[in-house]
Structure formats: C-alpha cells, structure tokens
Amino acid sequence: TLPDHSLESWNTVAISASVHVDADTHIEFVTYGKHADLMGALLLAPLTGNGNRITRPLKMLGNIIRHPLRFLRMLWPFGWSGRTLIILVMQSLDNAIAFRAKPKLFGKGIKLVTEQDAEKPNPTYIDAGNKAAEYLAEHTNGIAQSMSLEAMANIPSTAHILGGAVIGSSPADGVIDQNQRVFGYQNLLVCDGAAVPANPGVNPSLTITAMAEKAMSAVPDKR
C-alpha cells in the first residue's frame, strides 16, 4: 500500500502483469479498483514471515512494536484500494484442501468447513510471495501486508478453489463425464472450477472458460 494518498495504483486493468519467479511459482499483480476499501479489512496485518500458529502472531506483534507509526497508517482504510497493489501468488504444486460438513453451533442444519488435506496440505507460507512484497514495498516506499488470517492464525487463503467434481468414465470413479455431464442427472453440467482436474498454477479463468465452451459444444442444438 502506498502511503502517499496523492498516488494511485488503481487506474489500470485489474491484472496488469505477471511473472514466473521459479519453476513452480507464478505471481500476478492485481488492483481492486477505487471503491473496494472494505477489502482492506482482510489485509490489515503487517507482512509476517514463516512460522506456526504461535510464532507467526508473535512475529506480527514484534513488527507492530518496531514500527508503530507504520501500523497506525495501515489502520486508516479510506482510499486503501486505490493505493494498493495486490500480489496474487499461485503454484502448480499438487496440494489440496478438503471440505466437510459440520453441525451449526447455533440452530439446526450443517455448514461446510475447510481443512488441510492430510496427504497434500496446501502451504501456509510462500517465501517467494513475501520476497515480492518486500521488494515492491522497498521500491515504492510502500507498506507490505499479509492476509490477516495468515499472520494471526497461520491459516492460508485461496481465491481459486479447484476440483471436486472428478471426471470419470462412470459414477463409480467420477462425478462428471468427459463432457462435464453429471452422472445420473439429465441436462446437469458442471462448468465452473469444480470441473478443473488439476492445478494449472496460473489464474484459472481462461481454463474454466475453455472447458465450459467444450462442454457447451457437446450440448445438442434445441430444435
């Protein structure tokens, strides 16, 4: 986030550039536009290094104590999105999160919660992302920030939840067929990120679009 309120980073396309920093890691630079200051509430934590659920909050607290004025400037939300460049870090590694149903704490019914996949947990810290944030902050005199949940609870965040509707040859080994039709249901197709069978390591929007177009091409014309 740029500290000078006279400077703005929003007056460009939403995703302005990208770079592959290593064989597995791809970084995109994103702006939210001028009227998304509420998103700043998700990022109001100083950039915090690697650790666990005990050490990362302590590192964050230490950062606040060392730089109190910088932290106070972070808490001012007005104009945040117009002065902030988001670093979207993606990796092509095979990792996963799992969904499970959990009874609601209050009232009836269930809710979906996420948890780390036991065999392929997704990372809670990506060093390349932190280094990119530090580099940009140094060269723009800006303030580098972390997602609040990552800094305070060592819980990662994701914008691209992919998979879940497995492509198979029958209901015994999949949810959808090669044309993304749900087994056992007529005229029901899965055309969102749930149908993507692997992690592309880049923004999946074009992959999802291409797969949706392929699925639609197999739908018979209405006569």
Model-derived regions: residue spans:
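Hydrophobic/aromatic-lined pockets within catalytic cores
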Residues: 1-3, 89-90, 141, 217-220
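Internal hydrophobic alpha-helix adjacent to the cofactor/substrate pocket in enzyme cavities
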Residues: 132-140, 212-223
